[in-house]
Amino acid sequence: MSLNVKLHPSGIIFTSDGTSTILDAALDSNIHIEYSCKDGTCGSCKAILISGEVDSAENTFLTEEDVAKGAILTCCSKAKSDIELDVNYYPELSHIQKKTYPCKLDSIEFIGEDIAILSLRLPPTAKIQYLAGQYIDLIINGQRRSYSIANAPGGNGNIELHVRKVVNGVFSNIIFNELKLQQLLRIEGPQGTFFVREDNLPIVFLAGGTGFAPVKSMVEALINKNDQRQVHIYWGMPAGHNFYSDIANEWAIKHPNIHYVPVVSGDDSTWTGATGFVHQAVLEDIPDLSLFNVYACGSLAMITAARNDFINHGLAENKFFSDAFVPSK
């Protein structure tokens, strides 16, 4: 069975056999529509069903209002007939192919008790192409976890990852207690549609915890291109000592168009900077977001709260781009 899937407003058409999800069918055809977690948790792949029938698995993301408007999640919906969808399509990703690469652990730096900075070296013949902001799956002993790439494309070709220690986490235990330098690993990627769009709007980057990793990659890429858009970086952590890098402050000092506000959400008597929820700090400084693009990376709770509050403060819904960290299943 071959079913046609037509995308609006791009007019792109691809086929599905009806057994794979709409998202997988699109990616198999090298058609890049919006997605992130691929398991129905984050909602990035939300689309509007214009015509046709789909079989959708249950999910907790879509509201009754979403369903009434014809919204589906392409990562957990399968076509039952020819269908037409209103969904974002990104030709910028058409030249990028997801592959599995061997790599070695070139270096690992532990910062405090719960952050590890990994640098992975690929073979000289393996040239991974990605856009700043995308993520990879790290594969160790047959298990995999998704991590955002923390460095811009280019440089020495290494892949930088920021990993937070998770209590009783199987993968955390491997990374923090078992990994050895030069150990052979594998990565699969790049993946995701989290990248900076090419327009002239000023940018708000919103990061929670190691959600700073893709922000670092995207800002580095903007600096490398001498992009002069106004950039506002807000990075939230529970306490002042949790900030594991000072590079954002260095950017702000060196580049007049880059502005940085670290935000502490917990009880920290030594902290003299911004406090509270990181997205609320944005609204205190920029109460009208109607002329901004927002890129947010962090917990699903942070992403959801930021999206709702930012839209209530003028942000166009299609100007909010996110990559939510969701627990492994």
UniProtKB/Swiss-Prot annotation:
Entry superkingdom: Bacteria
The keyword Transmembrane is annotated on this UniProt entry: no
Annotated binding of [2Fe-2S] cluster, by residue: C37, C42, C45, C75
Signal peptide (residue range): none
Sequence ranges assigned to domain FAD-binding FR-type in this UniProt record: 98-197
GO biological process, one term: lipopolysaccharide biosynthetic process
Upper taxonomic lineage: Bacteria, Pseudomonadati, Pseudomonadota, Gammaproteobacteria, Enterobacterales
InterPro entries: 2Fe-2S_ferredoxin-like_sf (IPR036010), 2Fe-2S_ferredoxin-type (IPR001041), 2Fe2S_fd_BS (IPR006058), Beta-grasp_dom_sf (IPR012675), Cbr1-like_FAD-bd_dom (IPR008333), FAD-bd_FR_type (IPR017927), FNR_nucleotide-bd (IPR039261), MRET (IPR050415)
Span of domain 2Fe-2S ferredoxin-type: 2-93
UniProt cross-references to PANTHER family, sorted A to Z: NADH OXIDOREDUCTASE HCR, PROTEIN RFBI
EC number: 1.17.1.-
Known role: Participates in the conversion of CDP-6-deoxy-D-glycero-L-threo-4-hexulose to 3,6-dideoxy-D-glycero-D-glycero-4-hexulose together with CDP-6-deoxy-D-glycero-L-threo-4-hexulose-3-dehydrase (E1) in two consecutive steps. The detailed mechanism of E3 is not yet resolved.
Native source species: Yersinia pestis
Name the UniProt record assigns to this protein: CDP-6-deoxy-L-threo-D-glycero-4-hexulose-3-dehydrase reductase
